[in-house]
């Protein structure tokens, strides 16, 4: 009797988990690809800047030590569980060289507008394919994003 109950429970569990049909999947895929086509065809979208409110970030040649220190605190609280300061992937990509690969605007837009960037930006989508996990919204303020960018510059060797 106990085995019968276990078998019935497992059958019900697997039936509940597997409710995806081909028609639902194809509809979701086609609407997703349609939205990607319309978004990437948008002439106002700048892949060097990304999607968000940061259009021009003034970055001094010399590192702002105070901002970098504040950014290191943000990293310790909100970023270090998923990102290493090396090029090694943890959950998300490693940060070494990030400021060489992306503009300040792109990084700050990504950290403050993650979902829109993951839905629209080709570079963010490529990282998502590698990491397989969407970065959750960290609710960073504009100052936190700027300080975090300065810490990333410090990590990349800017003095």
Regions found by a protein language model. Give the residues of each.
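Sec-dependent bacterial lipoprotein signal peptides
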Residues: 1-15
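Electrostatic cytochrome c docking/interface patches
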Residues: 28-74
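Gly/Gly-Pro-rich "capping" loops immediately C-terminal to redox-active cysteine motifs
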Residues: 72, 83-113
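Axial heme c-ligation environment in periplasmic c-type cytochrome domains
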Residues: 90-98, 115-144
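C-terminal capping alpha-helices of c-type cytochrome domains
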Residues: 105-110, 133-159
